[in-house]
């Protein structure tokens, strides 16, 4: 479920650092008050990452209660966007990339070049 992303209507990343000692209520408060999103949005996964990027927490409302997910990678880390203090909605493809350890937000956008420095 967590690896393939099946069953999620939307996925949001809480970019930046999150204190992963927080539990369900603390993470739900971040979703509601910091990001102005609804933690009770059924089948929407909210992902959080701390300073150590080898572990993440996920929070999802299943209609009858919250499910708190925790994933720790033994060898490697998640490529977590650290640039903004907001919730970033990601696509299913971006979610797959994140779970594979790939970076989902480009550090430098690709720019159009009108005249390359070399010729063929």
Placement of each model-derived feature along the sequence:
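Polybasic/polar functional segments that serve as interface/processing modules
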Residues: 1-120
């Amino acid at each position: 479920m967590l690896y393939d992303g099946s069953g999620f209507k939307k996925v949001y990343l809480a970019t930046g650092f999150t204190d992963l000692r927080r539990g369900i209520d603390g993470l739900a408060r971040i979703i509601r008050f910091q990001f102005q999103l609804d933690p009770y949005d059924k089948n929407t996964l909210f992902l959080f990452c701390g300073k150590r990027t080898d572990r993440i927490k996920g929070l999802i409302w299943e209609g009858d209660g919250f499910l708190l997910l925790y994933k720790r990678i033994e060898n490697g880390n998640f490529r977590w966007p650290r640039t903004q203090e907001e919730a970033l909605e990601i696509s299913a493809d971006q979610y797959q990339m994140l779970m594979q350890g790939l970076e989902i937000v480009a550090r430098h956008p690709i720019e159009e070049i009108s005249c390359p420095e070399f010729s063929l």
